[in-house]
Each structure stands twice: as structure tokens, then as C-alpha cells.
């Protein structure tokens, strides 16, 4: 028996139940109408109308018969209910499958987005690395060019000095002694500079404050401040002393120049004839 035939049988069965509910009981159908006491004043037409209505009510209604089911076939309502449940389950399963497919698609899109972000981040890091490497190469190239130029300048100056020395050495031995003296003076200056560096290195001790506490750090800072203040005071006093010394030297030079002028004038006025000749 096909599904369409089963549904058709179900519809006929439901229509039969509704008709039986709406149909009146046999007692109501065959119950005689009550007698009506009509007053004498009522017109005969009204009586006839009432009789016609009573006759219509007393007419028997057609009996409803159940639909005929083909012989050899039985309607299994459990099977119908089971099919409905299976249909609902299939629809629910389809909804669940579509939900999980959409969720799986969203997860795949999220994974693809993360992969694109990671790829872009790696590309950006690679670009930064290449840019930094190029910048490093450029700095190295500039440093090499600078060192090469300095080396060429030093070589050129050395060649020029050598040419000057050769040209001047050909002029005589006197210049060689002059060069020796100049080299000696230069050596003395370098020695004095080295001595100054050595003295400063001895005076300037390394500041080791990693192991000190807060109180000792404050004491050390106060000590350094006092030392700096004393150095500035000494510097100011030495500057003032140097100014006074320069002023005294200028005064002495002015007096010496004035005395030299007066002595020259006195020498010219004291000239005279001594021993038959002018002095």
C-alpha cells in the first residue's frame, strides 16, 4: 500500500469522525415534536407554516457510512506514526548536518585567515630582515670607503712629507739638524701628553657602586658633589690668578717699553765730542 493511499484513508477516517460528532443521536432524531397550543387568534397561515417546519424536522437525515477499505489491505496506524517520526527525524538530521557543515566551513575560513596572517607576518619579518641587511651592507660600504679615503689621504700626506724632506735635505746639512730638532720637540710633546694621560688615569679611579646600599650611595653622591664643588672653586681661583698674572705681565712690559724709550732718548742727548771725535 503506497503512502498516498494511506494518507487518503487517514483523511477519510478523520472526516468520518467529524461527521459522527456533528450528527445528532437517534433519540433526538426520532423524538416527536411537542404539541403546540396555538391561540385562536393566530391565523391559519401561521399554523400551516408551523406544521411544515415540524414535518421538515421529522424527516429522517441520511446516515453516514464509513469509507470502504479495499479488501485484502489493512491500515496500520503504527506504521503511519512511525513513518511520520522517521520523516521528522530525517528533517532534524538534515538541519543538524547543515549546521555542522556551516560550522565546519566557518572553522576552515578561520584557519585560512590565521594562515594568511601568519604568512603575511613572516613576509613582513623577512622584508625587515632584508632591509636591515641592506642597511648594514650600506653602512659597512660607507665605512670601508671612509677608511680607504683616510688611508689614501695619509699615504698622500706621507708622500708629500717625504718629497719635502728630500727636497730640503738636498739644500744642505743645516736643515737636517733643524729636522732633528723638530722631531725631538715633537717627541717631547708626545711624551708630555702621555704623562698627562698617565696622571689622569691614576687620579681617575673606576666608580664601583654596584655593591653599595642606599645610604652608602647617598654618602658617595655627597662626596662626589663636594669634590666637584671643590674642583670648580679651584678652577675659578686659578682663572682669577691667571688673569692677575697676565695683568701684571702687561704692566711690566709697558714699563719696560717706557724705560727703553727714555733710555734711548737719554743716549741720543748725551752724545758729545770726546778725545777729538764725536761719540
Curated annotation (Swiss-Prot):
A Gene Ontology term for the protein's cellular component: troponin complex
GO biological process: regulation of muscle contraction; sarcomere organization; skeletal muscle contraction
Highest taxon in the source lineage: Eukaryota
UniProt entry tagged with the keyword Acetylation: yes
Residue list for modification N-acetylserine: 2
UniProt modified residues of type Phosphoserine: 2, 98, 169, 176-177, 213
Biased composition, class Acidic residues, residue ranges: 1-21
Keywords: Acetylation, Muscle protein, Phosphoprotein
Function: Troponin T is the tropomyosin-binding subunit of troponin, the thin filament regulatory complex which confers calcium-sensitivity to striated muscle actomyosin ATPase activity.
Family membership noted in the UniProt record: Belongs to the troponin T family.
Name listed for the protein in its UniProt record: Troponin T, fast skeletal muscle
Species the sequence originates in: Oryctolagus cuniculus
Lineage: Eukaryota, Metazoa, Chordata, Craniata, Vertebrata
Amino acid at each position: 500500500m503506497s503512502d498516498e493511499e494511506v494518507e487518503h484513508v487517514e483523511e477519510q477516517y478523520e472526516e468520518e469522525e467529524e461527521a459522527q460528532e456533528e450528527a445528532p443521536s437517534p433519540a433526538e432524531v426520532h423524538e416527536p415534536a411537542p404539541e403546540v397550543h396555538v391561540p385562536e387568534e393566530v391565523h391559519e397561515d401561521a399554523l400551516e407554516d408551523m406544521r411544515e417546519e415540524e414535518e421538515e424536522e421529522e424527516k429522517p437525515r441520511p446516515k453516514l457510512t464509513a469509507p470502504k477499505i479495499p479488501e485484502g489491505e489493512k491500515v496500520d496506524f503504527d506504521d503511519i506514526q512511525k513513518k511520520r517520526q522517521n520523516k521528522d527525524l530525517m528533517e532534524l538530521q538534515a538541519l543538524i548536518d547543515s549546521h555542522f557543515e556551516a560550522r565546519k566551513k566557518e572553522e576552515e575560513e578561520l584557519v585560512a585567515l590565521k594562515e594568511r596572517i601568519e604568512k603575511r607576518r613572516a613576509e613582513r619579518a623577512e622584508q625587515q630582515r632584508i632591509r636591515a641587511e641592506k642597511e648594514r651592507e650600506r653602512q659597512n660600504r660607507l665605512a670601508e670607503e671612509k677608511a680607504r679615503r683616510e688611508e689614501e689621504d695619509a699615504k698622500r700626506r706621507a708622500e708629500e712629507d717625504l718629497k719635502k724632506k728630500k727636497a730640503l735635505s738636498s739644500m744642505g746639512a743645516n736643515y737636517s739638524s733643524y729636522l732633528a730638532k723638530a722631531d725631538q720637540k715633537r717627541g717631547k710633546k708626545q711624551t708630555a701628553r702621555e704623562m698627562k694621560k698617565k696622571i689622569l688615569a691614576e687620579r681617575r679611579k673606576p666608580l664601583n657602586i654596584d655593591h653599595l646600599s642606599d645610604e652608602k650611595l647617598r654618602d658617595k653622591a655627597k662626596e662626589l658633589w663636594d669634590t666637584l664643588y671643590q674642583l670648580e672653586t679651584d678652577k675659578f681661583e686659578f682663572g682669577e690668578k691667571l688673569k692677575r698674572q697676565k695683568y701684571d705681565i702687561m704692566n711690566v712690559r709697558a714699563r719696560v717699553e717706557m724705560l727703553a724709550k727714555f733710555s734711548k732718548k737719554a743716549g741720543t742727548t748725551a752724545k758729545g765730542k770726546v778725545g777729538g771725535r764725536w761719540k
